[in-house]
Amino acid sequence: MAHQIELTQTVKDSQLGQRLDQAVAELFTDFSRSRLKEWLLEGKIAVNGDVITKPRTKVMGGEVITVQAELEDEQRWEAQDLPLNIVYEDDDIIVINKPRDFVVHPGAGQADKTVLNALLFHYSPIAEVPRAGIVHRLDKDTTGLMVVAKTVPAQTRLVRALQKRDVTREYEAIVIGTMTAGGMIDKPIGRHSTKRTLMSVSPMGKHAVTHYRVAEHFREHTRLRLRLETGRTHQIRVHMAYLQHPLLGDTAYGGRARIPKGATEELTEMIRDFDRQALHAVMLKFEHPVTGEELEFHAPVPDDMVEMTLALREDAKLNRTEEY
């Protein structure tokens, strides 16, 4: 289903000489530039009553711009009563702590029982917001914090904040191998040339930057704290694999079990049985899209990663050798 919207604004004198698409973006700030340009090209925007479809048309100031368009509801997806771990909620946003084995958006691999289905059940008006308010995603087996918009204006502003890199997203991870220092990875990411469900570092890919620092050393693993500067699909997983330090448990990107020499049977079994990428979105900080208040949220590291960290720490302690 869809619902009709009709909006009117008058071009400001200060916008004299601007392109129409630029003027429209400044006047109708509740919607993204890409959405407004799409409406413009589809003939859904009129200037003084005349439909204009050329983005480069210049405005003079004083023109009345009218938008008549449809907003698609997300009602093509079923509302499902699924548990949501809600960290924070108000009239404009929801912050959730996503567990493992929970897909964010329906797709070819999974048509329902996703975060989106749960959101539609929890707050039915969110069906009027594109993608049910989802502005960024976590992989199925990545745990941690996500922010969701409950209104179109909130969604537009959050998307812009992400694009401007005004949203801080930090992750906790366990990677394979010993890393001696932190750093930054600035490598473009694109679709894998042969494995189409995976991504890879590619000169033809999109700009991608990940910052990381070492939080703790183990014998054959390292605990990291990472910060996303961009938000590409599988970004941390791809970048760490590129450094030849894939995430523990991430078999898709080379994270095969590596057992420390002389490890106990219990630790050996834990490492072999760890069946997801050891990655958790631990901190999320951003300005509230309506009030402007700075918000910061933290999600405790899940039990499976805590238990693995404790086991690796104990192994390192037991096998520490003195240097002379």
Swiss-Prot record:
Disulfide bond positions: none
Gene Ontology CC annotations of this record: cytoplasm
Record's keyword annotation contains RNA-binding: yes
Active site feature: D139
Keyword RNA-binding: yes
Compartment(s) of residence: Cytoplasm
GO BP term (any one): enzyme-directed rRNA pseudouridine synthesis
Keywords noted in UniProt: Cytoplasm, Isomerase, RNA-binding, rRNA processing
Reactions mediated catalytically: uridine(1911/1915/1917) in 23S rRNA = pseudouridine(1911/1915/1917) in 23S rRNA
Class in the EC hierarchy, top level: isomerase
Main location: cytoplasm
GO molecular function: 23S rRNA pseudouridine(1911/1915/1917) synthase activity; pseudouridine synthase activity; RNA binding
UniProt-listed Gene3D superfamilies: Pseudouridine synthase, RNA-binding S4 domain
NCBIfam families: PRK11180.1, rluA_subfam
Family: Belongs to the pseudouridine synthase RluA family.
Chain's role: Responsible for synthesis of pseudouridine from uracil at positions 1911, 1915 and 1917 in 23S ribosomal RNA.
Name of this protein: Ribosomal large subunit pseudouridine synthase D
Gene: rluD
